């Protein structure tokens, strides 16, 4: 059966810092867990585009999206999505993505990198310290390989 409509959940941040356009890790865990327990399947961008064009998708479908490409998407969102077999579409600001090795995430245990709130992230980027707030290409590759995130470009600054 085809879904009559598909909910779209849009996030920027999953961080203990919280904020207006953020979910805390506990809230994000609860939301994704509830979707998974209810039998929802997360869609890819191509599946959602096909649905918008009249194509069929499972009755319990959801599109989970993230904007910009913040470090906390790797640190806190990636492990939750992996744990529940869900995926999200991340629209990156490619000019803010950096190089370097993969940093720790919450699914590994041990110390985690700081994941500041939205305003602090904007300040870090403006100060030329984007690596403290944004993803690295190595983390993008790891999330893509794990199947937790699909990446599209939002903009290049």
Locate predicted features.
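Conserved small/polar residues in nucleotide/adenosyl-binding loops
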Residues: 155-157
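Short beta-strand segments
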Residues: 8-11, 92, 152-153
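Active-site beta->alpha N-cap acidic-glycine motif
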Residues: 5-6, 16-29, 34-36, 41-148
């Amino acid at each position: 059966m085809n879904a009559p409509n598909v909910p779209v959940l849009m996030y920027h941040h999953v961080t203990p810092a919280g904020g207006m356009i953020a979910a805390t890790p506990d809230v994000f865990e609860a939301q994704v867990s509830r979707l998974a327990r209810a039998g929802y399947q997360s869609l890819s961008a191509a599946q959602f585009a096909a649905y918008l064009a009249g194509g069929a998708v499972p009755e319990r479908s959801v599109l989970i999206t993230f904007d910009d490409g913040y470090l906390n998407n790797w640190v806190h969102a990636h492990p939750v999505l992996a744990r529940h077999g869900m995926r999200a579409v991340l629209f990156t600001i490619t000019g803010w993505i950096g190089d370097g090795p993969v940093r720790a995430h919450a699914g590994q245990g041990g110390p985690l990198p700081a994941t500041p709130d939205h305003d602090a992230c904007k300040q870090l980027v403006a100060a030329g310290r984007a690596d403290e707030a944004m993803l690295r290409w190595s983390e993008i590759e790891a999330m893509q390989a794990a199947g937790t995130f699909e990446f599209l470009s939002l903009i290049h600054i």
